[in-house]
Amino acid sequence: MDRPFSPSSERNRAPIEQILKRAFAARQNVLEIGSGTGQHACYFSEALPHLRWQCSDRAENLPGIRSWRAHAQRPNMPEPIELDVNQPIWPSSRFDGVFTANTLHIMAWEEVQQLFARLPEVLAPQASLVVYGPFK
């Protein structure tokens, strides 16, 4: 399978990395919500090797993420998990960091509300949340 490619992910990864280095300096286990192509995960898991970078997305995006993961061969990037904010099943694990990029502005408002309502289920105490994207 060809790896999906997002030009914007390539352009914004370095500036985001600078923020993540500070925000996740003392973190170990990060959940990325809406991993999309998987490009960010591959880049950040290499740039921040102290983090276990858990990708998640809707089922239809998982093959592309798996393709990037297979290409990158990162030991700190486990198999991506299915996560749809509208579905009742969320990860049972707790994460001390959550990251999402370019998701909230494409979600329906009800989905954004659902995301923030459900986040406490996966956040460890004192966890960090980093959201990147355009806002109105």
Language-model features, listed with the residues they occupy:
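Conserved class I S-adenosyl-L-methionine
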Residues: R27-G36
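Class I SAM-dependent methyltransferase Rossmann-like catalytic core
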Residues: M1-A25
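A short beta-strand submotif of the Rossmann-like class I SAM-dependent methyltransferase core
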Residues: T100-T103, W109-V112
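A short glycine-rich, Lys/Arg-flanked "PGG" loop and its adjoining helix->strand segment in the class I
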Residues: Q113-P125
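Class I SAM-dependent methyltransferase SAM/SAH-binding core
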Residues: L31, C42-P88
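Conserved beta-strand signature within the Rossmann-like core of class I S-adenosyl-L-methionine
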Residues: Q126-P134
